[in-house]
């Protein structure tokens, strides 16, 4: 149960959930019954959408009901009806616990059999809310069925794929002023957004892929703006955190230069599998360094690629979820 389109808008293309979660589960060999709550609510209204969801769950009789809620699409009663009539344990992937645990997750997580979080700092909050027995710490990953090494030929020097939030434009300008022009794609940049295949190619064929934080300002995604409208959004700068990009770029065989964030060293050997920077000055210096050291850069990219395929694909993440539900962990 998730959005098929990015923020529910077909003009923006497939959603993260569609490109990563659904694609990975299908690649693992699982049969899925998809329900786009955003589209059904838009067409039929929220009340009717909830009825249709419960009916779909009853018809599917699936092994697990997996949710990626956006805001307040469902209430606890609907989730409990899905479990009761569908006969399957319910799971929600909580993507934003770093900023909306207290005014979102804490209220809806009790309705699920399992809450999956990517935020280690929220685990004490789950415990305090009496949810310690139903939370699983997971992490973003790479969907190996959608992100692959497509070429070993270099086509770009320094690239960034993402939106110009916070001080990103300023940082890009500083790198460019140091003699290293940065090619940028995404909503808000002149070049616009890449399609998925184009993005994968950029990751695979860039000397240096940048992963920039927007922690200098509050996040401003549509999910955040809707959350603010509902009284659930962050009001101040948020700490940097691990993102999907930390796994997607290495998963394409690309070299990643990313901001140092808490817990990243639990997933990679820093400096050996991905490169990290500590400040804008350090970033500018490292861009120059890595552009000049081809063999060392290639070794880091290859090590990161092997680490992702060995430990950090969505196959690994979903297998852990299935084990937590006592459904077994085989990917077949």
Go through each PLM region and give its residues.
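A charged, aromatic-enriched C-terminal amphipathic alpha-helix characteristic of glycosyltransferases
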Residues: 28, 292-323
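Short hydrophobic patches on amphipathic alpha-helices
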Residues: 57-58, 82, 203, 287
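Catalytic-core regions built around general acid/base machinery
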Residues: 78-86, 107-108
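Conserved acidic donor-binding segment of nucleotide-sugar-dependent glycosyltransferases
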Residues: 274-280, 289-294
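Alpha-helical elements of Rossmann-like donor-binding domains used by nucleotide-donor carbohydrate transfer enzymes
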Residues: 20, 48, 52, 282-289, ...
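Generic C-terminal helix-cap and adjacent flexible tail
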Residues: 325-332
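Active-site proximal beta-strand in glycosyltransferases
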Residues: 82-97
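Nucleotide-sugar donor-binding catalytic core of glycosyltransferases
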Residues: 1-52, 59-61, 67-77, 110-270, ...
């Amino acid at each position: 149960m998730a959005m098929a389109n990015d923020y529910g808008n077909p003009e923006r293309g497939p959603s993260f959930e569609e490109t990563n979660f659904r694609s990975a589960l299908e690649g693992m060999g699982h049969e899925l019954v998809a329900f786009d709550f955003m589209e059904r609510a838009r067409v039929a209204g929220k009340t009717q959408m909830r009825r249709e969801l419960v009916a779909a769950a009853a018809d599917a009789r699936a092994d697990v009901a997996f949710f990626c809620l956006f805001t307040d699409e469902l209430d606890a009663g609907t989730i409990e009806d899905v479990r009761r009539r569908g006969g399957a344990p319910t799971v929600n992937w909580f993507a934003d616990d770093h900023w909306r645990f207290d005014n979102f997750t804490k209220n809806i997580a009790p309705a699920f059999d399992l809450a999956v979080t990517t935020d280690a700092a929220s685990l004490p909050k789950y415990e305090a809310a009496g949810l310690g027995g139903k939370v699983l710490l997971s992490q973003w990953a790479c969907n190996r069925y959608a992100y692959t090494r497509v070429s070993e030929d270099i086509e770009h020097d320094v690239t960034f794929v993402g939106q110009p939030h916070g001080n990103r434009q300023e940082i890009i300008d500083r790198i460019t002023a140091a003699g290293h022009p940065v090619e940028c794609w995404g909503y808000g940049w002149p070049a616009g957004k890449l399609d998925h295949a184009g993005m994968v190619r950029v990751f695979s064929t860039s000397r240096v892929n940048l992963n920039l934080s927007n922690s200098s300002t509050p996040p401003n995604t549509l999910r955040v703006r809707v959350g603010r409208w509902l009284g659930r959004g962050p009001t101040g700068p948020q700490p940097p955190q691990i993102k999907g990009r930390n796994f997607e770029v290495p998963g394409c065989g690309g070299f990643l230069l990313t901001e140092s964030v808490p817990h990243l060293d639990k997933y990679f050997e820093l400096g050996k599998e991905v490169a990290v920077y500590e400040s804008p000055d350090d970033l500018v210096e490292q861009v120059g360094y890595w552009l000049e050291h081809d063999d060392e850069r290639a070794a880091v990219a290859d090590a990161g690629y092997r680490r992702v395929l060995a430990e950090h694909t969505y196959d690994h993440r979903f297998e852990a979820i299935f084990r937590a539900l006592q459904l077994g962990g085989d990917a077949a």
